Amino acid sequence: AIDAIAQSDPDFNQPVELSGDFLNLNLNTGSGVYKGNFIAKQGSMKFEGNEIKVKQKANKELDNIIALGNPVKFKKKNYSSGEIVSGSAKKITYDANKLLVILEGEAEITTDLGKSFRSQIITYGLTSGEIEAKGNSQRRVQIIIPPNSARKSTPIVE
């Protein structure tokens, strides 16, 4: 299954590159915190913000990334649709095991084709392209779908 994912989305065959102004890393556990204008990249996927926490599994593979900022920015190419997906939130979690990105706090996802999703919490499936949005009493889920570019009325009677 991982090979099929890697073929359909080459980003997951790439190493994760991290940079920031300050790093506190535990070499034994592989967990660390980057602070100050951090950037985390894996292929076309990119996170930018103020602070990032990285957790690795015992085998040193990436487990998750938790990014904090005001806002944190996220961008990735969806290789199935060809769309560029961008997002922002106060907190973004990348689950490298489930290939999910969870945006929390004033969350927004947009595509370069004009689709837009706003909510308190948005979960985005990196390989499936699925989006789940949850609102609350202060912010309901909002979806914007662009109009068709070339619409013509179909004759009622032929």
Question: What do these predicted ranges mean?
Answer:
Residues 1-158:
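Mature-chain termini and adjacent capping regions
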